[in-house]
């Protein structure tokens, strides 16, 4: 867990509550995702760790984000800058996504495979995970050649490793013990 998670929670909650009230949850998530990416830029990271006045820092950050932020999200950026918390934006995004998932009774499920999966395979995985987690799932598919064959499924703390690589690693552990 990140060191900013506790700091990020109230900002995420305020942003989420505002987004729900104004029926703009998707838009807010997109704005936060963009702003979080901006904080990862090397030049911006230097500005964030520098000694700029909060007002100057906020306006510089907002200028970089441009049209990606609306007036309300710019206000969030200003408040976070005043409190020296712009570095926490990636964690604010993470907490916002979590609040949205809880609100919508959905779960993010990562599916990692060596090759692209068919729609039928994805439908089976989705149905099985919805049954297991008792909620709707959103599949995030990734291709990783090191998996070799099979799939690795991650949902929160749960990991189902059905990959050949995982089986070989478990076999090696058994043989070494």
Curated annotation (Swiss-Prot):
One GO MF term attached to the UniProt entry: proton-transporting ATP synthase activity, rotational mechanism
Major location category of this protein: membrane
Bilayer topology annotation: Peripheral membrane protein
GO cellular component, one term: proton-transporting ATP synthase complex
Keywords linked to the UniProt accession: ATP synthesis, Cell inner membrane, Cell membrane, CF(1), Hydrogen ion transport, Ion transport, Membrane, Transport
Annotated SUPFAM superfamilies: N-terminal domain of the delta subunit of the F1F0-ATP synthase
Superkingdom of origin: Bacteria
Coiled coil: none
Cellular location(s): Cell inner membrane
Pfam families assigned to the protein according to its UniProt record, in alphabetical order: OSCP
InterPro entries in the cross-refs: ATP_synth_OSCP/delta_N_sf, ATPase_OSCP/d_CS, ATPase_OSCP/dsu
Alphabetical list of HAMAP family matching this protein: ATP_synth_delta_bact
Function of the molecule: F(1)F(0) ATP synthase produces ATP from ADP in the presence of a proton or sodium gradient. F-type ATPases consist of two structural domains, F(1) containing the extramembraneous catalytic core and F(0) containing the membrane proton channel, linked together by a central stalk and a peripheral stalk. During catalysis, ATP synthesis in the catalytic domain of F(1) is coupled via a rotary mechanism of the central stalk subunits to proton translocation.
PANTHER family xrefs: ATP SYNTHASE DELTA CHAIN
Family: Belongs to the ATPase delta chain family.
Oligomeric and partner information: F-type ATPases have 2 components, F(1) - the catalytic core - and F(0) - the membrane proton channel. F(1) has five subunits: alpha(3), beta(3), gamma(1), delta(1), epsilon(1). F(0) has three main subunits: a(1), b(2) and c(10-14). The alpha and beta chains form an alternating ring which encloses part of the gamma chain. F(1) is attached to F(0) by a central stalk formed by the gamma and epsilon chains, while a peripheral stalk is formed by the delta and b chains.
Name used for this protein in its record: ATP synthase subunit delta
Organism: Shigella dysenteriae serotype 1 (strain Sd197)
